[in-house]
Amino acid sequence: MGLEEKAGDLGIVTTTLEGVVNWGRTKAMWPMLFGLACCAIEMMAGQASNYDMSRFGLELMRASPRQADLMIVAGRVSRKMAPVLRRLYDQMPEPKWVVAMGDCASCGGVYNNYAIVQGVDEIVPVDVYVAGCPPRPEALIDGILQLHEKIKRDKITDHADGKPIRIEQAERGALKPLG
């Protein structure tokens, strides 16, 4: 006797709180584009009707990091631009994710010199790397789907100021209960 037989036509679904929260996070992401080169053009092509990235929860690009939870770094990052990238990342609220789009963002690309950062993972933690020079919009969509799978495995407590919330903290009064 399965759950469907017990519940009848009531439409009962059993899940976990983390499952619901992570499902919501994958369906309503607020990306901020940090486009610096030709990869940004492919990113814009991905927003066109041919690819319609809004199907994957990427409806609107945000200009402010305070309204974004996903940073897409598309293109090469110079050493002078690195502090700006870090400052924008630090201004994003938790939970936040980073996608390195293209070979320049992932590993410096063909620019192996003193002025170009050899991968943005030297500056910010990267969740998904999208390969290509420049990567096609299909590759970016695949990277977003990989990020969705990573988000679905997340724990809610992993995103509290970057540290898990412990029961002891709540008992000591470090965390105030709601209500």
Swiss-Prot record:
What Gene Ontology cellular-component terms does the record carry? plasma membrane; respiratory chain complex I
The chemistry this enzyme catalyses reads: a quinone + NADH + 5 H(+)(in) = a quinol + NAD(+) + 4 H(+)(out)
Q: Which GO terms describe its biological process?
A: aerobic respiration; electron transport coupled proton transport
- Quote the record's cofactor note: Binds 1 [4Fe-4S] cluster.
Q: Which GO terms describe its molecular function?
A: 4 iron, 4 sulfur cluster binding; iron ion binding; NADH dehydrogenase (ubiquinone) activity; NADH:ubiquinone reductase (non-electrogenic) activity; quinone binding
Stored Pfam families: Oxidored_q6
Question: Does Ion transport count among this protein's keywords?
Answer: no
Q: Which cofactors must be present for this protein to function?
A: [4Fe-4S] cluster
How does this chain sit within the bilayer?
Answer: Peripheral membrane protein
The entry describes its oligomerization and partners as: NDH-1 is composed of 14 different subunits. Subunits NuoB, C, D, E, F, and G constitute the peripheral sector of the complex.
User: Can you name this protein?
Assistant: NADH-quinone oxidoreductase subunit B 1
Lineage, top ranks:
Bacteria, Bacillati, Chloroflexota, Chloroflexia, Herpetosiphonales
Gene this chain is encoded by: nuoB1
